[in-house]
Amino acid sequence: MKRLKIFLYLGLVFLAYPSWMEARHIPPIVSTQWLNARIGDPSLTILDVRRVEAYQEGHIPGAINVYAGAWAYKKGVLFNEIPDQAELNETIGAVGISLSSAVVVVGNMDTVREGYQTIRVACTLLYAGLEDVAVLDGGMNKWVKENRPLSQKVVKPIPREFQGRYRTDLFADKAYVKENLGKIILVDVREPAYYSGEKKLDCVARPGHIPGAYNLPTSCAFNSDGTFKTKEELLVIAESVTGAGRDREIITYCDTGQCCPTWHFIMRELLGFPRVRIYDGSMQEWGADERAPVTK
């Protein structure tokens, strides 16, 4: 009986680490100390997604720069949409990244907009088929505060042809969300005032949220200095809306698709939730469709 319990325990541990997590060679969230020890490692690509002016003022030695805006674009009236695959192949190939590359995405994590953009870039690379993608915990602001090395040398990558293995199951469109209402766990990552309909952005036609959605603000995932909360804390927060079971599919959304990748990244890459998607169109698209239900 004791041996059986041990086997059962090991089986549960195995199930806790899905295949994509086992395939990783770097953790999804890396510390400044971890990255500092690997400066100059030819097997690691440091991708700085800040604006070029900030990059030129000082960046982590060896980092290449592609502004976060290049990794999402306006599609019709919708902001922050995932690029077409051909365009994304070109963007990734231009900076010399391959499917086997290990990439650490670096941005400023002490500002809401830039922090969310940084994580969205990481999710975009995962969508393209990379496995070893991480974000720098605390971002450049923490790196600079700790007086870690900086460089002003502009790094010119060697372009290469890139052909992604696209994980279309990481995203959901409006039709998919509509069809699966009541079957999926919808996670609205906006602040409570926007979830409740008390406030709304100008680009969102109707205030409120998708019926049945739980509110899990993205800001809950971070400490005041822009670092992530601990894995244990994040699991407790995530399970407050998803429950302990992991069988149901989870779809995250926000206003324009900019900040909902954060909880997607945390749940899937750090916590190992097996079925998590991003609704890219989010409330900007949903609210514009009069046939799509909205509640307060």
Predicted regions: what they are:
Residues Y73-A102, T218-I250:
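Helix-loop module immediately N-terminal to the HCX5R catalytic loop
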Residues L10, S19-M21, G257:
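Cleavable N-terminal signal peptides
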Residues R51-A54, G69-Y73, M109-R113, M140-K142, ...:
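Solvent-exposed loop/turn segments at secondary-structure junctions
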Residues F14-E57, M140-R206, V294:
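Flexible, polar/low-complexity N-terminal or interdomain linker segments that lie immediately upstream
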Residues M1-L8, S19:
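Bacterial N-terminal signal peptides that target proteins for export
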Residues I82-Y176, K199, G208, C259-V276, ...:
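Thiolate-centered catalytic microenvironments shared by cysteine-dependent enzyme domains
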Residues S43-Q85:
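N-terminal, post-signal-peptide region of Sec/Tat-exported proteins
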